[in-house]
Amino acid sequence: MIRAYVKLKLQTGLRRTDLLGLTKSHVTPDCLTVTLSKTQKKTGKVLEFEMTPELREVIVECNAILPLSPYLFKTRKGESYLKEDKTANGFTSIWQRWQNKMPEDKQFAERSIRNYVGHQGDEQGASEILGDSIETTRKHYRSNVTKVKPLSSSSRATKP
């Protein structure tokens, strides 16, 4: 289940609350439709991810995980990991157990996947897939890059 989650997050860059809230009704033959929970009440922004072979493959993988449920990512009882208050303690525990099985130098935070997606491609493309403005993408996902011009021999200060 975690591997399917990571694959889908790498393709979509969706936040944890949006991924864990996905149901089969969000999936059509043409696209995966997601109303972003962060801006749902403000703007109601909707992202439609084109149904590529890779996206279809990971959705089929999610649907194959038992038990049968309307949720793509579900508990052993078929319920959503996402609670009404938008917490996902059960999922967090599973994530931590999965990470603890990895060598320490290979472990990573769940939210770092969204950061990774935000660094891929050009700013416009990253902004579109994340559902953010270019300014937000620049601020949150590309802010650790500062363009610096190196000193040239003619611009170095001389010793006093």
Question: Predicted segment positions?
Answer:
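Short, basic (Lys/Arg/His-rich) helix/loop patches that form interaction surfaces
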Residues: 2-3, 12, 49, 66-68, ...
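Basic, Lys/Arg- and aromatic-enriched nucleic-acid-binding interface segment
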Residues: 1-16, 20
